[in-house]
Structures are given as C-alpha cells and as structure tokens.
Amino acid sequence: MSPSPFAPTIETIDYPFPPKPIPLSDAEKADYKARIKQLLIEKDAVLVAHYYTDPEIQALAEETGGCVSDSLEMARFGRDHPAKTLIVAGVKFMGETAKILSPEKTILMPTLEATCSLDLGCPIDKFNAFCDAHPDHTVVVYANTSAAVKARADWVVTSSIALEIVEHLDSEGKKIIWGPDRHLGSYIAKQTGAEMLMWQGDCIVHDEFKANALRDLKRVYPDAAILVHPESPASVVAMADAVGSTSQLIKAAQTMANERFIVATDRGIFYKMQQAAPGKTLIEAPTGGNGATCKSCAHCPWMAMNGLKAIEASLSDSDKTTHEIFVDEDLRVKALIPLTRMLDFAKTLNMKVKGNA
C-alpha cells in the first residue's frame, strides 16, 4: 500500500551516530562483571537486557537473575521483580516504558544518550500536528516511541499483536493513523487491507537490508530459510520464509526444519537465537553496500552503547542525572492507558504480547 498523500514526506535524516565503546581487555571485562554482580546485590537491582544488546551483556543479565527479551517484556519483568531498582540495557524509550509500568521503582540506564531512529524520527510536536490534522482517526503507535508519543496514542502495539489490533479496529470501521515505522505499517496494511495514514519513520538497522543482495546470498545458500523482521523494506519482507517479531523469529529458527538461516534483523538476536537453535547456522542478511557503505551494518549503534563500563557506572555513580529515567506523572498516566488497552486486548485473545524491536 502506498503512503497516504496526507502523510509527512520521507526525509533523509543523517542521525548522529555515537562513538563505539572502547574495547576492554579480558581482565577488565572480568573486573567489571564482578563489580556489577556485587553492586546489583548491594543496590537491590536487577539487570534487563534487550535482544539487540551485545552478547556479553545478555549473558550477564541471565547470570544475575535478570532477563533478556523485547522492550515490553523487559518492562513487565521489571515490574513483577521484587528489586527496587531496574537497570535497563537498551535504548531510552525502553527505560521510559519501564518507568510507565513501574513508577515506584528507580529506573537506571547505562546511558541516557542511547536513543532510537524511530524515536528521533517521530518528534512529539510534529506528530501532534499530524494527529490534530486528522481528528477522526484512531492513533496507533508502535512501542518503539517516546512516552510523549505513547501518551498521544489511542493504542500502543508491538509487532506481535499489531496485525490483530489493526484488524479489530478496521472491522469496527475505524480510520487509523499509524506511526512511526513506515515499513511495519505497510506490512500490516498489506496483511489486513486496512487504510492507514502512515508516519514516515524507519529503523536505521532494518531499513538497510537490501533485496538484491539478499537474493544473491540466497543463491549461495539455497537451503537456507530467510527470517525477516517486518521493520524491513517490503522487497525484503517479500523474500521471507518467516516474518515476525524478535521472539517470533527466535521461535522460527527453533521450530523450522532448516539447518541454516539468513536473518534480517539486528545481529544481537543471534545470542538468544543460537541458544534456542543450537547446532543451526545463522547468517547475517546483507545490508547496503555489503558492509562497505552500510551505516548500522546490522547492529544498532545505540544498543552498542550498553557496555560493561556504562552498566557499572549506572550502579556506582553517586550522581544519577546521566542514568535515571523520569517520566512526568501526567504523561505517564496518559501513556499507560493505550499500553493497558493493548494488554487487555491480548488477554481476550489469550496470547502473550511480545516482540517489539
């Protein structure tokens, strides 16, 4: 489905990429891990990590009784865990989602500078104006958005339940505004037939996957199944043997008979995917330039900021201003409404909501 003529035009945004963390020696890594484990106990804290963080961070979360999952499950785990402090290894909107669900807890992030192109590409002032121009539309936003954008929405969705919710709204004759990921929105529109006004954002990682290069790689590995996250361009999604959220792609690798998979999502997912499918071969899908001219090169630069040194600092720094997440209470209450609406809808379907990027 082509974008609505009323939707904002696609702008090429040159996102300011952060510098990569300085590599640590094995001895330094061991020291930081030991220190983090001790501080988690002392501070009554638990570490939750997103699928797209580096493998050693995911392993540390598991070793210390935390969790590795998508952003909504991270927030729910933190809400239900008895720890008073939640360390969120991910990007800023994930920390905000955790605070929305657990206002009484201290939410810390390794760095508040870890952001997301979907968040940056959907500033609340412009999104408000877009929604105000179409007051008869129901506003549906992806979970990969700021607390302010969530507060403006009627529904918040993850990629695992977006199809069902949009189908439900469409069956009721609702006109829909979708934001911010244009690729995911187009995929949902194609699957459901719903008419949607689409915000024109994208994920810098998934937007770089290229169908022509993927086709060439498939020729090299004809027996490989192609797994694609729906934040990818339509031409890439069209080549997929399985399309789904992070958790759904992990499940596909585990259950499909293929011994080899070409995976079109952030390579951070390989850690949990390999756990779920030991012995199977995982291959990165090609990005723009086959590594020569790609920008993200299949790994989110902001996720990469969640290093051991930064995690230790979030626990040890006496000044928490560069780590602690705050959400205005009025905004939090408003953002909680569409989140709760999604969770309640999921209960009626008897399904567990997982799977935003």
Swiss-Prot record:
Entry keywords, A to Z: 4Fe-4S, Cytoplasm, Iron, Iron-sulfur, Metal-binding, Pyridine nucleotide biosynthesis, Transferase
Annotated gene: nadA
List of residues binding iminosuccinate: 50, 71, 142-144, 159, 229-231, 246
E.C. numbers: 2.5.1.72
InterPro entries, alphabetized: NadA, NadA_sf, Quinolinate_synth_A_type1
Sites where the protein binds [4Fe-4S] cluster: 116, 203, 300
Task performed by this protein: Catalyzes the condensation of iminoaspartate with dihydroxyacetone phosphate to form quinolinate.
Location within or outside the cell: Cytoplasm
Protein name from the UniProt record: Quinolinate synthase
Cofactor binding notes: Binds 1 [4Fe-4S] cluster per subunit.
Cofactor: [4Fe-4S] cluster
A GO cellular component entry from the record: cytosol
HAMAP family: NadA_type1
GO molecular function, one term: quinolinate synthetase A activity
A Pfam family of this chain: NadA
Keyword 4Fe-4S: yes
Signal peptide: none
Reaction catalysed by this enzyme: iminosuccinate + dihydroxyacetone phosphate = quinolinate + phosphate + 2 H2O + H(+)
Entry's family note: Belongs to the quinolinate synthase family. Type 1 subfamily.
Example GO biological process: 'de novo' NAD biosynthetic process from L-aspartate
Pathway where it operates: Cofactor biosynthesis; NAD(+) biosynthesis; quinolinate from iminoaspartate: step 1/1
